Amino acid sequence: MKRSLLSSILALLAAPAALLAQNTVVVTANVTANTTWTRTNTYLLETKIYVTNGATLTIEPGTVIKGRPKANPVDATALVIARGAKINAQGTATTPIIFTAESDLLSGNLTQAERGLWGGVVILGRSRLNTASGQGNVEGIPTTEPLGTYGGTDDDDNSGVFRYVQIRHSGAIVAANVELNGLTMGGVGRGTTIEYVDVYAGNDDGYEWFGGTVNSKYLISSYNDDDNFDWDEGFRGKGQFWFGVGASDKGNQAMEMDGGTSPEDGQPYAMPELYNLTLNGSGATSTNTASNGLIFRDNTGGKIYNMILHDYRNYAVRLETESAQAQDSAKRLAAGDLAIGNSIFGTFGAGTTTTQMFTAPNATSGGAAPATNYTVAHITAAPQANQINTNPLLTGISRTRNKGLDPRPATGSPALSGARTPPADGFFSVTNYIGAFSSANWAKGWSAISALGYLTDADAANPDQPVVSGSTTKLYALSNRLTLAADGIFFGGFTLDGTQSKTVLIRAVGPGLAGFGIPGFLADPVLKLFQGTNEIASNDDWSGQQIVDLTRNAGSFALTAGSRDAVLIRTLAPGSYTTQITGKGGAGEVIFEVYEIK
């Protein structure tokens, strides 16, 4: 009896903090005003809940949101962020936000095979699509529901922040080719922040983008039924550090890339830019006959670099041609709008030759396939610097809860060299390796695969660091506090000497001054960086763990998550640079700082 009681106490103490919530709040009505969901409650979605009327739904770190099961997939429960509304879901590395099924006790009681127990999360925005009308009705929601409409003309649209989030056991097959995914994004703009998300054991795709320009980092698609990542209708966002792993018996494409609907000459073309992906299939010898690599269809383009694609039952890459259409992916390749480079192609059940791994373009909408295998010609071309039929030597691939999953490259892995340097554009992190992971395991701790015992217990660290030597920082330049008029512009200059590039942290702090009792701070500073007359970077509202870490290392004061302070991290060659600070719609106090990271 004493042993039983002690075991119960230990189990409670070891449980996630979210299990200690005392109240269950059943959500039956749409969110039409600014609302906060707290970690002291568990929220149970009774139906599809729409955040609408321009409202912001804030979800505290550690909060659990559950979806009630429905007999008919048409009625699947979901959280939908409508156009004009925002989600402010900012978990942390130690207290992620969890979306899951009602029956999930967060104790591991549900298995990987229990998929589709509720709908999922849908975010809709006003960014552009390539449909004829420039709008769409998102899959999985009745076309008669106006709150399911997405699209518009604002590529910078902001639907909020979605960070450190797990989405478990989601997905609903409403009809053929009509599904709710783990995370569905329709027309979401690049003003939105999406990073550190794990979609686990879903009944359809992990992620699907319908048009839009949203950028994303640190995405995990784990053991889902269909594709890891899927885009349609002219998606043009950027992505880095994407990881996908298939179940031994489930999973379709590593990535399914569609461009537009008929006619397939709709613009803008789908042309996302992706760096540092690790995509593992069901196993080259698995029984899952649907396990495929990449497929490019319709008029999609896209640039993919520093990718590891490995362990799929069938082919590595297939590129569609449609001679009956004015545009197709083969034409995007010929135009230079589609590229795969500096990537490792590992083991595939289709075979070891290039013609087996990279299948000939196939005609799916009429006409005959061309005589030339464009796919092989492109991927094997020397300028692409791809490594073909090469074992990436990952530390561990596992599809069971044995803590054997370790997607980091092992000693001697070819992924440790041969990478392409990402653009220095303010979004991409500087990397010198192929794949989503270096020696650091950024998935550890916050993700579902970590919480449920798939992932190794190896120490976690943050790979989102500039590739620089040493570990110290110094304040390189600091302006005095200044007052900016409503229409004022502040210019500050600095010079980097020497012969080597340097990484700098630049801050325009307005809202961050509130904690020091400074009244009248600049509410929304905008920071731009120039070399000569050339603008090379800009930032409005900062985000990202990299900034948090480098600010701490520099010894400066931390910024509140979600504040509208502006921050840039750039690796710059020696020379002179100018910064410009302006304010959006107001005047106020602001501090300008430049730190050199050494």
Across the structure, where does each feature detected by a protein language model lie?
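Positively charged n-region of N-terminal signal peptides that target proteins for export
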Residues: 1-4
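General helical structural elements
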Residues: 6-7, 511
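Bacterial N-terminal signal peptides
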Residues: 7-17
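Beta-strand/loop edge motif enriched in small/polar residues
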Residues: 22-467
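A sequence-level detector for low-complexity, Ser/Thr- and acidic-rich stretches
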Residues: 467-598
